[in-house]
Amino acid sequence: VRDAYIAQNYNCVYTCFKDAHCNDLCTKNGASSGYCQWAGKYGNACWCYALPDNVPIRIPGKCHRK
């Protein structure tokens, strides 16, 4: 498990405005909790605590949105 920005397909973060949205997203993916980090490295993005290793996280490199 790790603490990280949860990622969508193509290495893109989940943007957010409310902590509750991120907490729900993170816990549904097996994390202990999560919150919306404002003005972070990737803008306003969901950060998860104790996210399982099988869930994708944001890694260095570009977000490749289609």
From Swiss-Prot:
SUPFAM superfamilies the record matches: Scorpion toxin-like
Keyword Coiled coil: no
One of the GO biological process terms: defense response
Cellular localization per UniProt: Secreted
Keywords: Disulfide bond, Ion channel impairing toxin, Neurotoxin, Secreted, Toxin, Voltage-gated sodium channel impairing toxin
Record GO terms (molecular function): sodium channel inhibitor activity; toxin activity
Disulfides per UniProt: C12-C63, C16-C36, C22-C46, C26-C48
Keyword DNA repair recorded: no
SMART domains xrefs: Knot1
Domain LCN-type CS-alpha/beta positions: 2-64
Tissue expression pattern: Expressed by the venom gland.
GO cellular component annotations of the record: extracellular region
Family membership noted in the UniProt record: Belongs to the long (4 C-C) scorpion toxin superfamily. Sodium channel inhibitor family. Alpha subfamily.
Function: Alpha toxins bind voltage-independently at site-3 of sodium channels (Nav) and inhibit the inactivation of the activated channels, thereby blocking neuronal transmission.
Swiss-Prot/TrEMBL domain comment: Has the structural arrangement of an alpha-helix connected to antiparallel beta-sheets by disulfide bonds (CS-alpha/beta).
Name of this protein: Toxin Boma6c
Lineage, highest ranks first: Eukaryota, Metazoa, Ecdysozoa, Arthropoda, Chelicerata
